[in-house]
Amino acid sequence: KIMQKGDPYAHFWEKKPLTASISWNFEYDWKDKTWMGSRGKHNSLQSPYVVYEVHLASWMRPDPFDEESYFSYWQIAQRLVPYVKQMGFTHVELMPVMEYPFDGSWGYQGTGYFAPTSRFGNPEEFMAMIDFFHQEGIGVILDWVPSHFPYDSHGLFMFDGTHTYEYADMRKGFHPDWNSYIFNYARGEVRSFLISNAHFWFNYYHIDGIRVDAVSSMLKLNY
């Protein structure tokens, strides 16, 4: 059986239901130098963080009765920043924005670990959103899911016809609660993939932190 796979390192993907990887060059001109230069000096004991968690797909829609109706990254930023500032939050925590096929997963079953979802625009538009948050004094934290991934045929599962990213023993490699596959942390290549991915979002997208999801399934085998 021939499977069509996406590039695990792709920076952009076609909008669902299409699944092709798209080449992208990073040429964004960041304007958050002041924020980036000052964030390391922040003392959380004197100025605590107040974090607003948000799911971009459902926080606000152009048509509230159409679940396939989305604002762009920039349109979301224009609406979300004033609200966050008015409510007194210092940071937003974005539920997973890495490309994912199934809306019902809320992004927690991703296939494109190096790409912001194309539901709301392209990588440069996502950069512009983060840049705008920073210029307005708001930090950005990403939910990050290094624990499991879905079985979609274009994704990581059985990537080269073998158990490349997941455990071969399905007692360890399959999570019955989520109907998804567990990363094989025993493989150096898999650890490198995940660590590189975390660094990628900090270096290329200027994020301020990550919240690691489902750590219990990474540490324990009683799933």
Where would I find each of the regions flagged by the language model?
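The feature marks proteins involved in alpha-glucan
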Residues: 1-51, 61-64
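Substrate-binding/active-site clefts of carbohydrate-active enzymes
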Residues: 40-46, 55-223
